[in-house]
């Protein structure tokens, strides 16, 4: 260890306080801190901080974003409800791309389940389905099934590679989990793990914060750290070598995610897009979700906190909210576009500033847990690159079919928790059974009514999930039903299992057959 060189480097960068407790540390602690500091580029970090603060101050003083916002124009919008005559063509195109081994999925899985009350990665969480499957297993099985669907459709054996971005905190436990479960039936060589970067937390005056005498306070660099990680770990090269063209990017916490959704892929391909966003219709003006729109003619996501209530409440002539394209972190990119992002555009992206309450050691070495923000964490967002797309498109889907995020613990009595996620999936699977000709009966043998949901265009539609059930207690859900992804990717192929048959709930349909569960066991 050349401590004098390190001291000089830190002094030049104005970060010499990081060695304040050096002489108090044991040798092993010194080695640990030395290695951590040696790995940092302080000149770059100071530049990041300066640009992030400039951007933060500029946006704080910038004139209201409202006047510069335009909604997504209809010509770049595809809709699962309003373009039903084109859905089959988009699906066929997407399945063709999959059959040609040109589609991969990229999972953003850096988050721990801290808000869920667990210390392991979110993807390992079990929301309490009858099968006890975790989010990782559900998504892996959807990939397996979709490969089979594409193969059956076009006759070609195919592979959908799965790229999984973890963080420093989740990498090892995620890899161990996949190894333990034999990659859920996927081939190990087609599941590629890589790690997003970390950045130190900094005080408002640009000083790196120590969380212990020998440890810097570090945090992941946001889901937009994806692009730097793609470059650093040669992931784009791997995609190019495999002949991949289309990438579907999504977050781990959405239990309803249609991994490598052929309709979404096909829509983007047929539109000639290099970048696309899947959205759900925002129906409540105050719903805390960002909206995809144009600002000064450039596509981006505007966070709900940046939009005035008056603008959020604006409606178009058909009664829908004017700014209704709710962002769900579900995106399409072409590999050539990602190559351009990695080589050209990523360095142009500014970090966003998140003011945080960051525990730190004071000059006496005492751990302080502040009760108000005392510093910043810097992060980039995955959607920051929309602005660079040559052809950007938006695909709108039904929330009850495709979006139920897992953010909070049940104990927080809100939404987006294990109960709402579980109910959303079971409500959807209930609908699949009804649409395939199955029926549910109560304890007296009477058929339970199935009420089709009216489509927005006024025509009768297939039965869709009732999102009102998603917030109720598990015991209040009228129908508990789970269908393994290995049996059906999106409700297809269920007729042979359920048509003209009657079932008691809870019902499970999996590779071992059809099971009606009772309260005290099977």
Swiss-Prot record:
Associated pathway: Nucleotide-sugar biosynthesis; UDP-N-acetyl-alpha-D-glucosamine biosynthesis; UDP-N-acetyl-alpha-D-glucosamine from N-acetyl-alpha-D-glucosamine 1-phosphate: step 1/1
GO BP annotations listed: antiviral innate immune response; positive regulation of type I interferon production; UDP-N-acetylglucosamine biosynthetic process
Listed InterPro entries: Nucleotide-diphossugar_trans, UDP-sugar_pyrophosphorylase, UDPGP_fam
Subcellular location as annotated: Cytoplasm, Cytosol
Expression tissues: Widely expressed. Expressed at low level in placenta, muscle and liver.
UniProt catalytic activity: N-acetyl-alpha-D-galactosamine 1-phosphate + UTP + H(+) = UDP-N-acetyl-alpha-D-galactosamine + diphosphate; N-acetyl-alpha-D-glucosamine 1-phosphate + UTP + H(+) = UDP-N-acetyl-alpha-D-glucosamine + diphosphate; 5-diphospho-1D-myo-inositol 1,2,3,4,6-pentakisphosphate + O-phospho-L-seryl-[protein] = O-diphospho-L-seryl-[protein] + 1D-myo-inositol hexakisphosphate
UniProt entry tagged with the keyword Nucleotide-binding: no
Residues annotated to bind UDP-N-acetyl-alpha-D-glucosamine 1: 108, 110-111, 196, 222-223, 251-252, 290, 303-304, 327, 381, 407
Annotated residues for binding of UDP-N-acetyl-alpha-D-glucosamine 2: 472
EC number(s) on file: 2.7.4.-, 2.7.7.83, 2.7.7.23
KW Transferase (keyword) present: yes
Any one cellular-component term (Gene Ontology): plasma membrane
Gene Ontology molecular function: any one: UDP-N-acetylgalactosamine diphosphorylase activity
Subcellular location, principal: cytoplasm
Role summary: Catalyzes the last step in biosynthesis of uridine diphosphate-N-acetylglucosamine (UDP-GlcNAc) by converting UTP and glucosamine 1-phosphate (GlcNAc-1-P) to the sugar nucleotide. Also converts UTP and galactosamine 1-phosphate (GalNAc-1-P) into uridine diphosphate-N-acetylgalactosamine (UDP-GalNAc).
Similarity field: Belongs to the UDPGP type 1 family.
Designated name of the protein: UDP-N-acetylhexosamine pyrophosphorylase
Organism: Homo sapiens
């Amino acid at each position: 260890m050349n401590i004098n060189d390190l001291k000089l480097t830190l002094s030049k960068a104005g970060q010499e306080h990081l060695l304040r407790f050096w002489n108090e540390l044991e040798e092993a602690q010194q080695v640990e801190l030395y290695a951590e500091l040696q790995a940092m580029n302080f000149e770059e970090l100071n530049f990041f901080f300066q640009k992030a603060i400039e951007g933060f101050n500029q946006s704080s003083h910038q004139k209201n974003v409202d006047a510069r916002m335009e909604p997504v124009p209809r010509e770049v919008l595809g809709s699962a409800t309003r373009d039903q005559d084109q859905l089959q063509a988009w699906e066929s195109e997407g399945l063709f791309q999959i059959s040609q081994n040109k589609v991969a999925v990229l999972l953003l899985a850096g988050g721990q389940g801290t808000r869920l009350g667990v210390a392991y990665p979110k993807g390992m969480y079990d929301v309490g389905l009858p099968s006890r499957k975790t989010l990782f297993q559900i998504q892996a099985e959807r990939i397996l099934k979709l490969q089979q669907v594409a193969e059956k459709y076009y006759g070609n054996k195919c592979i959908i590679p799965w790229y999984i971005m973890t963080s420093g905190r989740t990498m090892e436990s995620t890899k161990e989990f996949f190894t333990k479960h034999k990659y859920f039936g996927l081939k190990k060589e087609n599941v590629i793990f890589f790690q997003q970067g970390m950045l130190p937390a900094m005080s408002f005056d640009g000083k790196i914060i120590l969380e212990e005498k020998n440890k810097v306070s570090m945090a992941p660099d946001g889901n937009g750290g994806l692009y730097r990680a793609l470059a650093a770990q040669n992931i784009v090269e791997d995609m190019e070598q495999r002949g991949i063209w289309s990438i579907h990017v999504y977050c781990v916490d959405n239990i309803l995610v249609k991994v490598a959704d052929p309709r979404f892929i096909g829509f983007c391909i047929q539109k000639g897009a290099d970048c696309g966003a899947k959205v759900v219709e925002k129906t409540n003006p105050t719903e805390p979700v960002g909206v995809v729109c144009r600002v000064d003619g450039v596509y981006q996501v505007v966070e709900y906190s940046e939009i005035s209530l008056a603008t959020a409440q604006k409606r178009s002539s058909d009664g829908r909210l004017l700014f209704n394209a709710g962002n769900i972190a579900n995106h399409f990119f072409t590999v050539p576009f990602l190559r351009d992002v990695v080589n050209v555009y990523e360095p142009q992206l500014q970090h966003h500033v998140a003011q945080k309450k960051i525990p730190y050691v004071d000059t006496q070495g005492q751990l302080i847990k502040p009760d108000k923000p005392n510093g910043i964490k810097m992060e980039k967002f995955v959607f920051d690159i929309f602005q660079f797309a040559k052809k950007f498109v938006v695909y709108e889907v039904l929330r009850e079919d495709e979006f139920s995020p897992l953010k909070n613990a049940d104990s927080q009595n809100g939404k987006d928790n294990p109960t709402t996620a579980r109910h959303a999936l079971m409500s959807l699977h209930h609908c699949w059974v009804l649409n395939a000709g199955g029926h549910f009966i109560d304890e007296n043998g009477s058929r339970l009514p199935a009420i089709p949901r009216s489509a927005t265009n006024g025509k009768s539609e297939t039965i869709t999930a009732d999102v009102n059930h998603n917030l109720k207690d598990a015991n209040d859900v009228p129908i508990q039903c789970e269908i393994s992804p290995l049996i059906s990717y999106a409700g297809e192929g269920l007729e042979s299992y359920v048509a003209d048959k009657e079932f008691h709930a809870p019902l499970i349909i999996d590779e071992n057959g059809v099971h009606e569960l009772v309260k005290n066991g099977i």
